[in-house]
């Protein structure tokens, strides 16, 4: 039999002879046709499932001439198909269905084009007809914002470090907290020896102890102020009691010595006259008469002033 043209596995024409080569080539073509027919029938029968899962069918041939059909729903750097994340606050990586550690510019751009065509209000596919216009527009905006953030290297770096630049996720940390978290991560991942790790742990304990020291210091100051206020009030009360006692003793002494008379000139004259009358007279009538006479003398003395 004359030499026939044979087809290799990659689709290029190669020379071969013999009926066996020709039969193998025909068998390969029939296998390829059957595989393509099966894959097309599956894709046409379940378009919604394929769009939801993002499955991609590929026909490949083995070295022995057998054809196989594989469904690859995931590739390196992808979380899954075109399904939308279930969380209420998805990250830009979750919106685009990408893994944080395995994203390159080519995959990012390809994924963005797929999702943009899927959720664009004017070109939404049959799989997205169940979504309202507002929901499709919201998802389309999230896809655009996620692509704008991840395609910019500086914005993406800031988001990975401090979770800034993305308004649809959890609230970012304050600058002071973010700086502290970055410093702790840097110190942890750059600790080369056990001594560095020990120093890192001791620094954390020192910060914790210093915080407790501030609390104890504040409590001691408050207790000191309370003790000082108590001592001041106690001293005032003791001084007032002592002063009252001294005044009472002085009044009692004056009462014993002067019989209720004061220390001025007129009081001293009245006291002198009273003691003199007490020594001269014995009867009540005589004492009363002497008292009236003494009082007249005292009044004359006061009038003479």
Curated annotation (Swiss-Prot):
InterPro entries: DjlA_DnaK_co-chaperone, DnaJ_domain, DnaJ_domain_CS, J_dom_sf. Keywords: Chaperone, Membrane, Mitochondrion, Transmembrane, Transmembrane helix. It is a single-pass membrane protein. Pfam families: DnaJ. The chain crosses the membrane at residues 212-232. Its main location: mitochondrion. It is found in: Mitochondrion membrane. The keyword Mitochondrion applies. Residues 91-163 form the J domain. GO terms for cellular component: mitochondrial membrane. Disulfide bonds: none annotated. Probable chaperone. Belongs to the DnaJ family. This is J domain-containing protein 1. The gene is JID1.
């Amino acid at each position: 039999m004359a030499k026939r043209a044979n087809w290799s596995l990659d689709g290029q024409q190669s020379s071969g002879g013999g009926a066996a080569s020709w039969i193998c080539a025909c068998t390969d073509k029939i296998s390829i046709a059957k595989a393509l027919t099966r894959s097309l029938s599956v894709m046409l029968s379940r378009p919604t499932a394929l769009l939801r899962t993002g499955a991609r069918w590929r026909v490949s041939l083995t070295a022995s001439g057998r054809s196989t059909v594989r469904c690859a729903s995931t590739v390196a750097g992808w979380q899954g198909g075109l399904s939308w994340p279930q969380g209420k606050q998805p990250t830009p990586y979750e919106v685009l269905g990408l893994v944080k550690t395995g994203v390159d510019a080519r995959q990012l751009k390809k994924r963005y084009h797929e999702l943009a065509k899927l959720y664009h209000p004017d070109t939404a596919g049959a799989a997205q007809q169940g979504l309202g216009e507002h929901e499709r527009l919201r998802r389309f905006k999230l896809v655009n914002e996620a692509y704008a953030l991840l395609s910019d290297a500086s914005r993406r770096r800031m988001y990975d470090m401090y979770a800034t630049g993305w308004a649809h996720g959890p609230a970012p940390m304050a600058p002071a907290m973010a700086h502290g978290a970055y410093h702790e991560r840097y110190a942890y991942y750059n600790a080369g020896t056990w001594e560095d790790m020990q120093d890192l742990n001791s620094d954390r304990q020192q910060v914790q102890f210093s915080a407790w020291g501030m609390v104890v210091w504040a409590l001691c100051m408050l207790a000191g102020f309370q003790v000082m206020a108590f001592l001041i009030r106690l001293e005032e009360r003791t001084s007032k009691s002592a002063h009252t006692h001294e005044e009472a003793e002085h009044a009692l002494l004056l009462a014993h010595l002067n019989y209720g008379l004061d220390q001025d000139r007129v009081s001293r004259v009245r006291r002198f006259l009273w003691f003199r009358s007490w020594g001269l007279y014995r009867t009540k009538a005589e004492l009363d008469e002497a008292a009236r006479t003494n009082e007249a003398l005292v009044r004359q003395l006061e009038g003479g002033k």
